[in-house]
Amino acid sequence: MLDVNFFDELRIGLATADDIRQWSHGEVKKPETINYRTLKPEKDGLFCEKIFGPTRDWECYCGKYKRVRFKGIICERCGVEVTRAKVRRERMGHIELAAPVTHIWYFKGVPSRLGYLLDLAPKDLEKVIYFAAYMITKVDAEARHRDLPTLEARMGVEKQQLEDKKNADVETRQKRLETDLAQLEAEGAKGDARRKVRESAEREMRQIRDRAQRKIDDLDRVFDRFKNMKVQDLEPDELLYRELRDRFGQYFDGGMGAEALQRRLADFDLAAEAESLRETIRSGKGQKKARALKRLKVVSAFLNTRNSPMGMVLDCVPVIPPDLRPMVQLDGGRFATSDLNDLYRRVINRNNRLKRLLDLGAPEIIVNNEKRMLQEAVDALFDNGRRGRPVTGPGNRPLKSLSDMLKGKQGRFRQNLLGKRVDYSGRSVIVVGPQLKLHQCGLPKQMALELFKPFVMKRLVDLNHAQNIKSAKRMVERARPVVWDVLEEVITEHPVLLNRAPTLHRLGIQAFEPQLVEGKAIQIHPLVCTAFNADFDGDQMAVHLPLSAEAQAEARILMLSSNNILSPASGRPLAMPSLDMVTGVFHLSTLAEGAVGEGRAFSSVAEAQMAFDAREIALQARISVRLRDTTPPSDWVPPADWVTGDVFTLETTFGRCLLNEALPEGYPFINAQLNKKAQAAIVNDLAERYPKIQVAATLDALKSAGFYWATRSGVTVAIEDVVAPPNKAEILDDYEQRADRVQKQFDRGFLSDEERRSELVQIWTEATNKIAEAMEKNFPQTNPVYVLVNSGAAGNMMQIRQLAGMRGLVSNPKGEIIPRPIKANFREGLTVLEYFISTHGARKGLADTALRTADSGYLTRRLVDVSQDVIVREEDCGTERGILTRIARRGADGVLVRDRYAETSAYARTLASDAVDEHGEIIVPAGTDAGDVAIGQIIEAGIESVRVRSALTCESRMGVCAQCYGRSLATGKLVDVGEAVGIVAAQSIGEPGTQLTMRTFHSGGVAGDDITQGLPRVVELFEARSPKGKAPITEVSGRVKIEETEKTFKVVVVPDDGSEEIAYPVSRRSRLRVREGDRIEVGNQIVDGAVDPHEVLRILGPRQVQLHLVDQVQEVYRSQGVSIHDKHIEIIIRQMLKRVNVLESGETNLLPGELCERARFESENRRVVESGGQPASARPVLMGITKASLATESWLSAASFQETTRVLTDAAINARSDSLVGLKENVIIGKLIPAGTGISRYRNIRVEPTEEARAAMYSVGAYEDGGSVEYGAFGTGSGQAVPLDEFDYRSSGDFR
């Protein structure tokens, strides 16, 4: 087998018949498969051992040679080579066809490549291929021109002869008529009889004349056709063609079927055709030029590559290895077989029949019919159903052809190459493990034993509990007591990976240290639930075991859950206390007035602890405590003589003292009630200021405290806790009367239906809000339901309003608000009508969720595909450019406050230029990471906006550079070279997409909470579609005039430079953004609505369209409260604007109208300019993500995405080469991906052992006799982990 590490590129091309024969190990001559009695393959059949190799290892067909010692011998009796049976997965055969056939991909694909090459319409091509018309393949124009006078004279003679014969025949008949009439007259016949004889004779003479005329016309037609005959003319009339062939056969060649095309392609002059097409493009216009461009693409593809157009017509068909189209026996003695075998059998049967007919010398019509059937059989084999009705198997199911094996989710690419099944894995239901540390998970004993079986077996042998591996295996299977001790030892510090499907972002797979637990459920830490989006209502998770030392090191360093506290999308912590933990911490930090022990003072926290244990003080009582070695709260006002580090007394509660013990040393004392937001802010602050280990420890301490005190807080929910406001009935009566008044006005005709609806909606919205207010005031502070909402642990006021206030207005399935409210709440219970109305919205919510989850998954897939080759490839691209971002706004009082969007725009980026204040002083120099501190300093200096590096301005040829990307949000440090930032970006955008789609579900369909604008709008932006009812933008600067007509407004812009006025018709319904006489700039919007991004690109250029798209996408996510950093969206948009459309090709190799990557365009121009030639010109193109993915340079990546057959057809004709720079292509061929530690600069590192490691090696028992030690192989064979800490990566020069 080919080793994937020995090549750097993969080229695809057109296989010629010789190539196919070269791959083949023999010709398949018979349609037989397996002998059903002996169950052995038939000789020369589709499973023949002589061709494809033995079915059993080291055994020939007849049994003469058995065992491995005969390896490589070819049996002289049966002709089978003695080798491994797995060669049946790689050896191919072939079928020699009795007549050539065309490859359906090249003739039937859209556009038809054969059609473009030969300039034939697909309809005409089909007629020729399927024997409905003849095609002229060759005309000897010289000979025809030379002999034309002779032939014309000969024709004249022949016509004259026909003319003479006609005249003679007519004359003879005339004479006979006269004789007959004379005879009748002599006999005295009546006039009637004489008339009949005359009429009959005249009829016969007319027929003679007509017959002769027809022959003459035919001759004229034949001769005309011959005179004007050119190559590629079609002739559907068989008789005419035969006449031509019989008369002028020496002057031309013609034929039907693939044979005719093959002859035509053999004579086809590519260079001359390309030249004439270029001439057409230079001089032509419109449709003609467009077609010439398309044809030139195909012609030049054949010219510039080693492909021969003859490859599109096949003389033999490859037969794929038999193990890839297996045939297995079922229980009942019947066979199940791959569809391909049926398709191959049809081809072989028809081919053999055609051979026999040709040998017999059968009539042409029968042979042609058989050839047509052979062509159809090969079509069905390559792409069943592409032309005509598909070939069906039993039960009318279309058979799966070779194309179907590649296409779609179940095809070879997506099913087997990009998604493989993994051994050393298991799955089980998850339960919570509140006792675990953040980096641990609970693994059921049985599962752990099965996963670590080989390790346990080896250790049993090492410790002499078992003599050999076999007995160790037996011990493990019988679960002997010693096995469990060994298992404990083996799993220590051996991380496992946990994964929950759907894996929407990289935190869906994390590493944990396993702890053995009883039972059969996996236990996971409560704080990682957010990242996995897991709950414990029956979710399952999969466990995978990293085996090699490198895999374990990566799992521990990069994937351990305690190293993944931050979200890669926003850079904020994901491991936040939630639910019970929030309740517990809230309870702990609450101060209750008048509690036991209020006002007492204590000399230390320990003394307060004793008082609490003795029940002298309550947890929430207000007490004073002297604190030493503690940082005071940030808002504490120190006494005049106090210095840092002194003891101080603080009025607080014992609960808060306990809470602060969970926080790291040196963290300011927290003396406030902490709801979920406040707790999140603390975790955020910790993540910014402390190392990850400390943050993880603190989170664990908070988790333990939260659970412990949540239990003791006694927060429970009973039906009595849902307290309705006492004055609800009065409020409702009041609003009921107002609603009645509106209804009466409507009945009298004072209001239109529209007005009535909006009035009622307004009235009832007000009523709902009023009841909600009354309800909130009525809730006691200690009410458990109120505590749950107030602490942020669960629910929100809107849900409480529905429980205790009133349900309010709901919407119908169209999304309109129903003007009758639901006055009841869930505590009272709904009436039947109210219940029915409210099911509308709820059902729509569920249906929406189901539909949009699929849409969101598809969006993620497209995003991943377009951005998968964006990897950080270098430290710095050296660009001077950047984008200007606003970090602060002036408040009403003129003070600068941090912009609320700075979090997702300027934060975590590298400054592109110095931040300079008004005195010219540099506050923060260029190249600094803009963290919270730097942004704070810049704002203090009065600077509103800064220029930051961005992926949009990065000048790296491939991927992006670390400086332009800035800080990796997941680690809080500058991004490493090799980070797959494209995939992170796609996941960061796609993951909340699914969240959005699922969020409608929780509001229970209450009006105004449904986000139909969300996902479809994001898709519309990323696919660069023109929005429906798009708002026009101005193309010039000038003054506005507005003209009204009956149906529309006409906004006219009078340009400043006095050129022609431009009118924009807009609907009367739209809201205008301009008034009469306004001054308007280029690119301003005239009405409210969505703008067409292609217009923005055309009028304002690439930079503006980039910013516009980022802004619009962010608008959708922000409206849902989702925080995604701009840099992720920028990476996708960088990919959408990566290509240019060539306008003039100059002296380059580019074609006008061709789409090509900007990097290729620039390097081609550079090459031409250096040699003094004329460069090409182009304009930037905005491509949607689907189109951009399919237009990628890598054909493997594009083929595995969508439209597999079209991509492969195109790639084969252009002999495209895949340089394997992206992730997908490397996964497909089984190489390490060029990201992370797979990037070449990390693969080329040699790890040398440290002195300590060498010493440790010597002390191992095996080496104590002083045997020689091979340093080079250190840490590889032994499976020992290699410490990489001491190795300085930067000092090694050969990185690239």
UniProtKB/Swiss-Prot annotation:
Mg(2+) binds at residues 535, 537, 539. GO terms for molecular function: DNA binding; DNA-directed RNA polymerase activity; magnesium ion binding; zinc ion binding. One of its GO terms (biological process) is DNA-templated transcription. Zn(2+) 1 binds at residues 60, 62, 75, 78. It catalyses: RNA(n) + a ribonucleoside 5'-triphosphate = RNA(n+1) + diphosphate. Binds 1 Mg(2+) ion per subunit. Its cofactor is Mg(2+); Zn(2+). Keywords: DNA-directed RNA polymerase, Magnesium, Metal-binding, Nucleotidyltransferase, Transcription, Transferase, Zinc. It holds the Pfam family RNA_pol_Rpb1_5. HAMAP family: RNApol_bact_RpoC (MF_01322). The RNAP catalytic core consists of 2 alpha, 1 beta, 1 beta' and 1 omega subunit. When a sigma factor is associated with the core the holoenzyme is formed, which can initiate transcription. Belongs to the RNA polymerase beta' chain family. DNA-dependent RNA polymerase catalyzes the transcription of DNA into RNA using the four ribonucleoside triphosphates as substrates. This is DNA-directed RNA polymerase subunit beta'. It comes from Frankia alni (strain DSM 45986 / CECT 9034 / ACN14a).
